[in-house]
């Protein structure tokens, strides 16, 4: 099995979402109740107040305030007099992210109890858990549901295809509704009209786990670690150059360098933060920047879903970026022209920069195509992809100059940025083979 099939866990500071996992492989129902105790019963307003007090944010990438999601569903229920639905987004379709899989495999009741807490507060009668094809994670979640009668009556597991865009909220809602599981052509709010056209509270699996921790600890204890404006701990998925890839739980405010050090992960030319819709930081900045949304934003980064991918030494940075640009172009749902046409144009331009055939003209094409795509898609995929590529062009200036003016940087493309298995990434993987020495 791959070492990330059952992710290793590391901690800096107190264990919260990873509590008990230092002594148990998987936390069953009895152990979960022993470690976390009973969840308090809370009203929707109490839950909103707690989430607001600690500024609880979504853990899936966008970082949307959880209290605002809750309030939007409460308002929609009052307006329509329809019962709400709760959806746990555990698809985790992005390569490099495995924090949700870790919780599903090893602490499934933390996710499920958080979802049940929200469902009770909202008076929802049904919870959907959206998953993809990780059999170990799916078996663990299904076994956890089967072992608890209250969950058996409440929770249904729904499997999405293994694609990058499967976790987009609109794509997940469409999938559950029996439609093609791609982002809708027109942006819609799940809180207004989601599963079965009912008001739907949809959030990431780790967000529900955080909600359970918040309910157990209460806002004051929850906020006793981390920075005051963004308290608590977060889960980071660290791989790339890491000799010890792991899910790391740490308080906000901890320097990213401390996380890289415990994972034995040299930064090399740079570190990608926030996954393939994230941004690059140079090594010096990466080691000093504090973990958290505000700290990373102040340094030009983005927290996203907590993915940390250091490049390490000895690989071609732009070659790595080009592989991923090709993969992301192939993951488009193909329904928006800027995405369907623009992302392949960016990928081709990046490939010709790296192989030395494109020069300054290819660089101009990449930048123009990115500008043409940005802000024009129905979902976040084109914007995220252009952000990833343009950030690389800003951070890897020395490598860019070597390729544009001298055709090569002389380093191989080692494949430090992960790609999923399967035919849809064959072209991107072939690039790595073709550029044995770029």
Put a short name on every predicted segment.
Residues 112-118, 251-267:
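Short amphipathic, charge-patterned alpha-helical segments
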Residues 1-180, 434-436:
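Iron-sulfur-cluster electron-transfer modules
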Residues 1, 35-50, 77, 82-84, ...:
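Ferredoxin-type iron-sulfur electron-transfer modules in oxidoreductases and energy-metabolism complexes
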Residues 62, 67-70, 97-100, 139-144, ...:
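Short acidic, glycine/serine/threonine-rich loops at helix termini
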Residues 69, 125-127, 264-276:
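Short loop-to-beta-strand transition segments
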Residues 231-244, 250, 256, 418-438:
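C-terminal accessory/binding modules appended to enzymatic or scaffolding proteins
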Residues 121-128, 241-244, 331-332:
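Short, surface-exposed connector motifs at secondary-structure boundaries
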Residues 1, 82, 133-252, 263-266:
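Hydrophobic alpha-helical positions that pack around
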């Amino acid at each position: 099995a791959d070492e990330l099939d059952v992710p290793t866990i590391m901690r800096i500071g107190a264990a919260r979402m990873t509590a008990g996992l230092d002594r148990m492989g998987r936390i069953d129902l009895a152990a979960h109740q022993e470690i976390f105790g009973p969840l308090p019963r809370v009203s929707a307003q109490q839950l909103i107040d707690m989430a607001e007090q600690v500024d609880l944010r979504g853990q899936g990438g966008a970082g949307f305030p959880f209290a605002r999601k809750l309030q939007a569903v409460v308002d929609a229920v009052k307006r329509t007099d329809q019962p709400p639905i709760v959806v746990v987004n555990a698809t985790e379709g992005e390569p490099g992210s495995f924090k949700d899989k870790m919780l599903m495999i090893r602490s499934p009741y933390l996710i499920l109890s958080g979802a049940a807490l929200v469902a009770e507060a909202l008076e929802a009668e049904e919870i959907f858990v959206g998953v993809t094809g990780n059999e170990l994670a799916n078996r663990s979640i299904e076994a956890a549901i089967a072992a608890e009668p209250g969950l058996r009556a409440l929770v249904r597991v729904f499997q999405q295809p293994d694609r990058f865009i499967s976790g987009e909220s609109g794509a997940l809602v469409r999938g559950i509704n029996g439609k093609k599981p791609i982002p809708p052509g027109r942006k819609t709010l799940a809180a207004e009209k989601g599963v079965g056209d009912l008001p739907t509270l949809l959030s990431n699996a780790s967000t529900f786990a955080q909600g359970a921790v918040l309910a157990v600890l209460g806002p004051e204890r929850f906020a006793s670690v981390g920075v005051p404006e963004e308290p608590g701990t977060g889960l980071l998925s660290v791989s790339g150059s890491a000799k010890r890839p792991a899910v790391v739980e740490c308080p906000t405010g901890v320097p990213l360098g401390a996380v890289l050090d415990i994972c034995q992960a040299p930064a090399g030319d740079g570190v990608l933060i926030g996954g393939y819709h994230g941004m690059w930081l140079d090594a010096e900045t990466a080691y000093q920047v504090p973990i958290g949304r505000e700290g990373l934003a102040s340094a030009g980064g983005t927290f996203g879903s907590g993915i940390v991918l250091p490049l390490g030494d000895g690989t071609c940075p732009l070659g790595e970026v080009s592989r991923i640009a090709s993969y992301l172009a192939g993951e488009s749902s193909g329904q928006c022209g800027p995405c369907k046409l623009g992302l392949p144009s960016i990928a081709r331009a990046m490939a010709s920069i790296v192989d030395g055939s494109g020069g300054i003209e290819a660089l101009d094409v990449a930048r123009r195509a990115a500008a043409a795509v940005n802000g024009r898609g129905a979902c976040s995929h084109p914007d995220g992809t252009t952000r990833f590529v343009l950030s690389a062009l800003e951070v890897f200036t020395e490598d860019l100059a070597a390729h544009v003016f001298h055709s090569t940087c002389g380093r191989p493309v080692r494949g430090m940025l992960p790609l999923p298995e399967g035919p849809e990434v064959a072209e991107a993987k072939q690039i790595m083979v073709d550029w044995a020495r770029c």
